[in-house]
Amino acid sequence: MTTLRIPAMSPSGPVSVYRWRVNFDAYAHRAVDLVNAPLGGLDDLKVLLRDESWMREEAAERDIATFRRAQKKLREVFELGAGHRDMDAVTALNALLELHPMQPRISGHDAADWHMHVTSRGASVAAEYLAGAVWGLAVWLCEYGSARFGVCADERCGNVYLDTSSNCCRPTWTGRAS
């Protein structure tokens, strides 16, 4: 998320308050991170969740199968994008959106740390992570098109990527967000 300083009004005049802006690209990067991650066991899952301390702490063996299923289905979306099969990518993403629905809510203790969660209170680690990843990739597809994501063309690689380059012309993910 990005921190913005926005002036707010109080009885004594404007005050500066921190506000959070939702960064949908960060959610799309979750999809990339998941697809490219090894998921051999709980330790691997915790590495994937390294930037989200509460998720890392609450991750359990029961989450691994859910993450693996989503990993496979998300890879298919990236492969469809790489193959210029836009309608199929949209269909696959819509199916994932149904499997991992969002229920956005505002969280925080006061105006200085309001932020969004993509699932309801008490949702599992898998529900929170996957709803965000799928939503982020769907927003990315709508914003940039499937030509801006795919699978690395280097046969030794196979990683998926989001193309953040200025000219959208590299067949491998070097220099791209992965």
Predicted regions and their residues:
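Short helix-coil boundary/hinge micro-motifs
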Residues: 1-151, 155-162
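Residues that scaffold the ATP/ADP-binding catalytic core of kinase and kinase-like folds
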Residues: 160, 177-178
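Cysteine-rich micro-motifs
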Residues: 165-176
